[in-house]
């Protein structure tokens, strides 16, 4: 089903009409978002979790799906509802064969300082939608007092710890090369780093580097209304795609009936295949 999806996505990409939907013909803006689905009550799945907000007393999973400006669904995976979506952002950007992203957006659940650092080093511009901007922390090259003395209105919380970044720089580059090799996923590597009782020094160093990238993005984000509008527009496509997925995934009371993550991913990619086929049909019909 993954190969079939890739072929449809590649064919859509070869059409002229989808190119009209892009803001910039030289830049591909993508986004990702999670959608919750119930697991059938009689199914015992280790990949399912509880969330009263979404499932009440039942269990369910989260389907994390990637979409580009032309509405092509180029990657999707089923994850445990208790996991943070941000850990899977890089998986979709690196482990698909047909869509090259230049700018990637998520909602608040999809970003972290570590993801800011990793996406920058991998060559992607990470541009999430920021909720409660006033609660976000800025970081500076110098101490906060230096910026205060210069009369800056926006002040950093503290100075970046360049020492820990420099000490672990070689390991950071090795980590990036491992992700680029695609022998394993970034989500698996990050799980390993965060499994230690204390923060691993490599994880801490990547996070510290990410604070630099995040701070720069926040300053641009608050200054440029066009950027905020572009991010909102792209994330609206993710949310519209989720509603479309609900309409497609109507069998079995819109519940997953498989226990293993592998089977759940097969079912999910079949749903994605139908969605991509409908999108392709619409392009051909309009054209």
Where are these regions (language model features)?
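Short, conserved catalytic/metal-binding motifs centered on acidic residues
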Residues: 1, 30-36, 104-109
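Helix-centered, glycine/charged polyanion-binding patches within enzymatic domains
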Residues: 125-163
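Acidic, metal-coordinating catalytic cores used for nucleic-acid/nucleotide bond scission
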Residues: 104-116, 132-137
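Short, basic alpha-helical nucleic acid-contact segments in DNA-binding proteins
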Residues: 2-19
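Long, compositionally biased intrinsically disordered regions
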Residues: 150, 157-287
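Glycine- and acidic
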Residues: 1, 71-79, 98-102
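Short, basic/hydrophobic alpha-helical segments
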Residues: 85-103
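Active-site cores of enzymes that catalyze phosphoryl transfer or operate on phosphate-rich substrates
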Residues: 17-85, 89
């Amino acid at each position: 089903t993954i190969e079939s999806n890739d072929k449809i996505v590649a064919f859509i990409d070869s059409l002229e009409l989808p190119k009209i939907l892009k803001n910039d013909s030289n830049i591909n803006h993508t986004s990702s978002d999670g959608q919750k689905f119930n697991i059938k009550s009689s199914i015992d799945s280790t990949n399912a979790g509880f969330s009263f907000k979404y499932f009440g007393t039942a269990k369910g999973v989260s389907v994390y799906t990637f979409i580009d400006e032309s509405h092509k669904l180029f990657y999707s995976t089923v994850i445990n509802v208790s996991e943070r979506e941000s850990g899977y952002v890089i998986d979709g950007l690196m482990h698909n064969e047909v869509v090259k992203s230049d700018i990637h957006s998520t909602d608040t659940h999809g970003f972290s300082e570590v993801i800011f650092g990793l996406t920058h080093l991998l060559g992607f511009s990470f541009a999430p939608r920021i909720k409660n901007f006033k609660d976000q922390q800025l970081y500076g090259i110098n101490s906060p007092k230096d910026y205060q003395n210069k009369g800056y209105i926006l002040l950093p919380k503290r100075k970046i710890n360049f020492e820990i970044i420099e000490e672990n720089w070689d390991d950071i580059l090795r980590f990036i090369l491992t992700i680029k090799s695609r022998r394993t996923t970034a989500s698996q590597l990050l799980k390993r780093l965060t499994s230690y009782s204390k923060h691993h020094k490599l994880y801490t160093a990547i996070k510290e580097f990410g604070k630099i990238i995040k701070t720069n993005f926040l300053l641009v984000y608050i200054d440029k209304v066009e950027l905020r509008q572009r991010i909102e527009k792209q994330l609206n496509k993710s949310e519209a795609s989720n509603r479309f997925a609900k309409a497609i995934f109507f069998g079995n009371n819109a519940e997953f009936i498989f226990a293993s993550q592998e089977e759940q991913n097969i079912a999910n990619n079949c749903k994605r295949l139908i969605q991509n086929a409908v999108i392709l049909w619409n392009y051909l019909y309009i054209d």
